Amino acid sequence: MMAGAFAPHARRRAAVDFAMVNHAALPHLEALCRRWLPGGRRIGAEWVCGSLRGEAGESCKVNLSTGRWADFAAGHRGGDPVSLAAAVAGIGQAEAARSLARMLNVNVEGGW
């Protein structure tokens, strides 16, 4: 077989539609934050907690309208629910997007 070729029956994972997952997650972001960052609380339009580990405090903030977030103590930040899910779980963004899509019952992958 030629270098770089793949077996005819091999299946590649389809690309994830990050925009679709983020769009689906935004209306549920407060509930997701309650699950992922349980020591936090809502203050105005933000979910506020101590860090991405989810303890009480005010160093980590998630804008519930836009999905932008920052853990100011650790210097981590992101712009959407998928990046937040990835940071909280310590996984890659594609894996986080697939997991979040399953949680929200959103089909984001096309088949071959």
Name every feature range the model reports, one short phrase each.
Residues 1-112:
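N-terminal structured subdomain of primase-like DNA metabolism proteins
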